[in-house]
Amino acid sequence: MEAETGSSVETGKKANRGTRIALVVFVGGTLVLGTILFLVSQGLLSLQAKQEYCLKPECIEAAAAILSKVNLSVDPCDNFFRFACDGWISNNPIPEDMPSYGVYPWLRHNVDLKLKELLEKSISRRRDTEAIQKAKILYSSCMNEKAIEKADAKPLLHILRHSPFRWPVLESNIGPEGVWSERKFSLLQTLATFRGQYSNSVFIRLYVSPDDKASNEHILKLDQATLSLAVREDYLDNSTEAKSYRDALYKFMVDTAVLLGANSSRAEHDMKSVLRLEIKIAEIMIPHENRTSEAMYNKMNISELSAMIPQFDWLGYIKKVIDTRLYPHLKDISPSENVVVRVPQYFKDLFRILGSERKKTIANYLVWRMVYSRIPNLSRRFQYRWLEFSRVIQGTTTLLPQWDKCVNFIESALPYVVGKMFVDVYFQEDKKEMMEELVEGVRWAFIDMLEKENEWMDAGTKRKAKEKARAVLAKVGYPEFIMNDTHVNEDLKAIKFSEADYFGNVLQTRKYLAQSDFFWLRKAVPKTEWFTNPTTVNAFYSASTNQIRFPAGELQKPFFWGTEYPRSLSYGAIGVIVGHEFTHGFDNNGRKYDKNGNLDPWWSTESEEKFKEKTKCMINQYSNYYWKKAGLNVKGKRTLGENIADNGGLREAFRAYRKWINDRRQGLEEPLLPGITFTNNQLFFLSYAHVRCNSYRPEAAREQVQIGAHSPPQFRVNGAISNFEEFQKAFNCPPNSTMNRGMDSCRLW
């Protein structure tokens, strides 16, 4: 076969590409070294006579990378984020198709480029597993823009002609079979079909996850669902921005209905009612600050839920959502089945609202949400209308390239297949060894500070905190099960993709995703396993398993620097991220879970009160940061958990780094990087800042403040380092400088 004979050509291409890369690195390194030597000769940079310098290619590369990011005209004690990041931000403007851009999105894009290359390789029946062949076919169908344009809206209209998907606003404009009937409308049937077949959660979010108070067991959970707009407050506020977003959403709903065949005046009338309904739903949603672990844990059986909220057939809904052909052992779900109802008051209010609302409006809203979720899978005329909407709410001015959209889709639809493809080529197993060094260093640092510097926690609580810290399990790179081809092939055996039917392929993946979590119901939680996509550029803490997780996608420069680079760079970047995730086990939410992952009080009352008192300092510190780009102050209470993790992680990683210097180098500092005059401690803090370099459009800035779990990047950097005396020592920041909070510094861990 032709595809089988291409391997030698591909190898040749790789060899040529490798030669070009080596040449570029050599030439680039020579230029950097030459520049450094010139600057030294001119007295503009100095090489300290008593210091050892590293002139290896890796060190020259690192020095060049740092020089390209910094702005030496800014005083690091006045604004360290600008000092560290201005150069990078200036050289990396926000792409027109993105609402924000930074080092995280930059690395995400580089991972996507690698996945694109892997997915575009011709299918080899000999080399590629069945699952990988399916991933390539799915990608090919997504890239088949000619077929997508030819299909236009036909696949969606086919769905809209059948119950329960008939859209009232379309009336008889798509044929008599598409006419909605109030008499035949069933809220339960519609909600169950959306969730069970299309993975669309509207009004109600039903899913399976570990029981917070019995973390070895899985349980059904019920929660409020999302809205059309990302920010709940945009339905409630009367600010100019919020009004413009609601207006843009309304026009988008109207135009989408018209594109699908609705009469414009009918669409305008009906969508006003739809928007009013969604505003009512936004009003009753439980805000983030009230969604505490304790408040969200309301365990009861379905019979008790039905007695509390009798307006809805909860048992009937759950049984219709779960496909018992896939899971025959779940046929016996009965009124005695336990569920965790995370938002009881929301559900009471929801069915009060729905009980007084016209069925036609409810149906229009439900189908709108299904249509909205499928717009990315339609032809260009729908994409361009979405872009007009995106201009208002995100500030983007162009669509993502089709390949980028397709890679993102395949990655979300078949994460473990794509993850294996990535890991096989781009993940080096020796990274696990260095990550173990970093994890154990952070673990030691946390316990060391707990024993030597924590004066507010009593001995009993401190003992349990150390037990939990010792029990934290680190997962690195990828879950082992993705390497089991037989297992992954079997998991996808029911899926049959066609290169000519992208929309149909999407529907298959939605059904697969819709049913996947029910696999775990009635099964024990595998505490040593993890289920994170290996290509994810992020890291995580899981309270229910007491795990910290670092996927392969995250373990790349400038986050993870190999052993051939100064350790200061890795400890400052991925090391702080390790500390950040580790500290999540002891933040305002994670601290409530014990070493086994159970929501079980293990703090003394006295220690808990002192913890809460100390958090007030951090809440006030971050709440006082005003972001001009967003026109808003940071929400210190909303971002508290992440701010605790940032501050604790920074301290832990720095202490771990200094221990590494003492243990591995007998206290001798690492060789310095040439020409940039930064000490190793300064490089540590620069590396911390560099992975958080980011810039935002005003729309994205506003959204980040409104719903982001993290503080904006500049305040993440400046907030944590201004609380840390070791930073002030490293950069000689005087007591009255902005980056030295002195006696006002906040600290928990």
From Swiss-Prot:
Coiled coil feature spans: none
PROSITE patterns named in the record: NEPRILYSIN, ZINC_PROTEASE
Pfam families the UniProt entry points to: Peptidase_M13, Peptidase_M13_N
Membrane topology: Single-pass type II membrane protein
Tissues where the protein occurs: Specifically expressed in ovary. Expressed at low levels in kidney.
Assigned keywords, A-Z: Biomineralization, Cell membrane, Disease variant, Disulfide bond, Glycoprotein, Hydrolase, Membrane, Metal-binding, Metalloprotease, Protease, Signal-anchor, Transmembrane, Transmembrane helix, Zinc
A single cellular component GO annotation: Golgi apparatus
Entry-linked SUPFAM superfamilies: Metalloproteases ('zincins'), catalytic domain
S-S bonds: C54-C59, C77-C733, C85-C693, C142-C406, C617-C746
Annotated Zn(2+) binding sites: H580, H584, E642
UniProt record, GO biological process: bone development; bone mineralization; cell-cell signaling; cellular response to parathyroid hormone stimulus; cellular response to vitamin D; lung development; odontogenesis; organophosphate metabolic process
InterPro entries documented for this protein: MetalloPept_cat_dom_sf, Peptidase_M13, Peptidase_M13_C, Peptidase_M13_dom_2, Peptidase_M13_N
GO MF: metalloendopeptidase activity; zinc ion binding
Cofactor stoichiometry and binding remark: Binds 1 zinc ion per subunit.
Leading EC class: hydrolase
Residues on Cytoplasmic side: 1-20
Sequence ranges assigned to domain Peptidase M13 in this UniProt record: 53-749
Transmembrane segments: 21-41
EC nos: 3.4.24.-
Cofactor(s) it depends on: Zn(2+)
Glycosylation sites: N71, N238, N263, N290, N301, N377, N484, N736
Active site per UniProt: E581, D646 (proton donor)
Family label: Belongs to the peptidase M13 family.
Disease connection: Hypophosphatemic rickets, X-linked dominant: A disorder characterized by impaired phosphate uptake in the kidney, which is likely to be caused by abnormal regulation of sodium phosphate cotransport in the proximal tubules. Clinical manifestations include skeletal deformities, growth failure, craniosynostosis, paravertebral calcifications, pseudofractures in lower extremities, and muscular hypotonia with onset in early childhood. X-linked hypophosphatemic rickets is the most common form of hypophosphatemia with an incidence of 1 in 20000.
Name under which the protein is recorded: Phosphate-regulating neutral endopeptidase PHEX
